[in-house]
């Protein structure tokens, strides 16, 4: 009696049903894409190693896979296809298909047997408009359909074609275009699918005056004015709306900007647009480290106040110390600047950039102590093009070996920039080009000269996935009509070092004095070719060949090129690559190193 009570008080644990080891094989295997699609949807395959189950669970998995795999066949255009799943040779649809326990060393065979049949094709494509008088408009939009008779009858392709059709209508100025109905009829006799779309284009519309919400420190009137200049009264187009959104993001004070279109037109027949924004933290700090053999360590940092006055103005204080370690801290180079960027300057589509700074440079080519000030107006011509210009002033002392002379320079700078790349630190496709011209006037000796510099680079994504990139760069500089001695030391052209010709010491290429120090020149030629190869998710490499020359007069010297070559390693981060390059000079001169190491953030160009 006592024994029975103990059993009732402490019941024996329920025995777990034995798990079954199994292995899945998909047949036939002659269509790799189809097999991959099946493996992507099959729970039998996904849970094979990670989630053991018993016989009933395995049977449930197999039966649940039947509709999934059937849909996968249809998604690839096999509308008449069939699938059969067998466990140890038994069809899982049979009532007696429940599998028995198996030896883990001999897993049960699970066969997924496909009978895809022929792939169905697109038959007739019809588009009907509501109202009927818009048929001509649909015929025009159909040029962007991306679907034609005879194409595989894949649902994803049909939906993509539908989206392309609506986008074409929206680009034509119809913001409310919609699909009223889509009829897809499969004919199993002809193995085709006929598609009929009924489309309502809706009315043509212009943009209404945009509204903005979500600001906490930024004046919303500023943003509404910026958006209205680009949208209000303009014919509707998704691209125009996206450009306005990017213009707001370009202010640099928002973490995101979302453009929401109204579902209906206003009473005056225009489309209201509402922008929702979220501001970034008001303050930001950052820094950068770099290293170059025979130049030393470079460290820079900045502090930024975004939206300092409520008009999306940005004040940045930044400093840099360079040549740390090459000659000791006493001969290091120091730079400090304060920059204020003001968008919508004077209520126009201009950005003003006011900058003051001080530099103390100790270089092999010259020593300079100077104060600088500049005022620049920038205007974007498009998403890829911008122009800028304005006056600048420099005053200080410059010379060599302690023989310093006073100088005062007035200049007026003008710049054109083109850039259609998407990543400033790691460009993989596109082009960049800039040309700047600055005439200078020396107030102390009444000397006049000008400096012109053009730089271009192209990037080719050879494999289409960013894994293999060919990068090309060229630069041409000239001081038209001037000899080298008429140009102040810091405004002369120099070549050599990181960002120029790797393998050589900074500024070392070109004419030299009796002490073997660079004199600079009145013209510049540089060219680079670099192959960038991704090896793994986080690692890559580069092979490069750089060349450059500095001419004594304003005519570029193509005959005196000095070349350097080498290899590099890239550690790829979410922000940009960390770069380590080793360059070897091919035209060594006196005191040139046998190699040089460069470490920095971002690609070399």
Regions found by a protein language model. Give the residues of each.
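Beta-strand secondary-structure signal
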Residues: 23, 70-72, 82-84, 109-113, ...
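Conserved active-site loop/cleft motifs that coordinate metal ions or position small ligands
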Residues: 541-544, 577-583
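Extended beta-strand-rich architecture
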Residues: 272-280, 288-304, 380-381, 388-390, ...
């Amino acid at each position: 009696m006592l024994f029975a009570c103990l059993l009732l008080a402490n019941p024996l644990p329920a025995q777990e049903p034995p798990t079954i080891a199994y292995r899945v094989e998909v047949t036939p295997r002659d269509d790799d894409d189809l097999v991959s699609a099946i493996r992507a949807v099959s729970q039998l395959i996904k849970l094979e190693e990670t989630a053991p189950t018993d016989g009933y669970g395995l049977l449930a998995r197999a039966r649940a896979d039947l509709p999934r795999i059937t849909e996968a066949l249809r998604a690839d255009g096999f509308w008449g296809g069939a699938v059969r799943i067998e466990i140890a040779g038994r069809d899982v649809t049979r009532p007696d298909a429940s599998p028995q326990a198996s030896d883990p060393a001999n897993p049960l065979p699970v066969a997924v047997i496909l009978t895809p049949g022929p792939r169905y094709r697109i038959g007739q494509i019809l588009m009907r408009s509501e109202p009927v008088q818009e048929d001509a408009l649909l015929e025009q939009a159909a040029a962007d359909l991306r679907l034609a008779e005879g194409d595989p009858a894949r649902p994803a392709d049909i939906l993509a074609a539908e989206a392309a059709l609506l986008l074409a209508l929206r680009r034509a100025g119809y913001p409310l275009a919609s699909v009223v109905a889509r009829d897809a009829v499969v004919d199993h006799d002809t193995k085709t699918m006929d598609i009929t779309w009924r489309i309502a284009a809706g009315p043509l519309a212009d943009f209404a005056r945009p509204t903005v919400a979500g600001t906490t420190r930024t004046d919303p009137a500023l943003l509404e004015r910026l958006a209205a200049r680009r949208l209000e009264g303009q014919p509707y187009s998704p691209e125009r709306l996206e450009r306005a959104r990017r213009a707001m993001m370009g202010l640099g004070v928002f973490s995101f900007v979302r453009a929401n279109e109204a579902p209906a037109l206003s009473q005056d027949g225009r489309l209201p647009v509402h922008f929702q924004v979220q501001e970034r933290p008001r303050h930001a700090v950052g820094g950068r480290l770099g290293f170059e053999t025979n130049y030393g360590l470079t460290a820079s940092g900045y502090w930024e106040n975004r939206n300092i006055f409520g008009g999306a103005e940005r004040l940045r204080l930044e400093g840099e110390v360079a040549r740390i370690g090459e000659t000791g801290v006493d001969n290091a180079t120091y730079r400090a600047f304060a920059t204020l960027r003001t968008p919508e300057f004077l209520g126009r589509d201009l950005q003003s950039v006011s900058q003051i700074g001080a530099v103390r440079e100790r270089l092999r080519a010259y020593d300079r102590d100077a104060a600088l000030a500049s005022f620049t107006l920038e205007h974007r011509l498009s998403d890829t093009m911008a122009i800028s210009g304005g006056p600048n002033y420099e005053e200080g002392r410059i010379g060599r070996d302690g023989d310093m002379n006073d100088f005062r320079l007035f200049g007026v700078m003008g710049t054109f920039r083109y850039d259609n790349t998407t990543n400033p630190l790691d460009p993989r496709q596109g082009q960049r080009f800039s040309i700047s011209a600055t005439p200078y006037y020396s107030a102390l000796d009444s000397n006049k000269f000008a400096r012109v510099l053009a730089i271009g680079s192209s990037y080719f994504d050879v494999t289409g996935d960013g894994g293999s990139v060919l990068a090309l760069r060229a630069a041409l500089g000239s001081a038209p009509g001037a000899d080298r001695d008429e140009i102040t030391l810091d405004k002369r052209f120099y070549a050599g070092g990181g960002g120029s010709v790797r393998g050589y010491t900074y500024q070392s290429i070109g004419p030299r004095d009796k002490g073997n120090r660079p004199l600079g020149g009145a013209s510049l030629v540089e060219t680079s070719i670099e192959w960038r190869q991704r090896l793994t998710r986080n690692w890559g490499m580069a092979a490069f060949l750089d060349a450059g020359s500095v001419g004594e007069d304003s005519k570029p010297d193509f005959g005196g090129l000095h070349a350097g070559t080498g290899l590099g390693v890239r550690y790829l981060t979410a922000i940009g690559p960390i770069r380590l390059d080793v360059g070897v000079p091919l035209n060594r001169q006196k005191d040139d190193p046998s190699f040089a190491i460069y470490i920095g953030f971002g690609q070399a160009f």
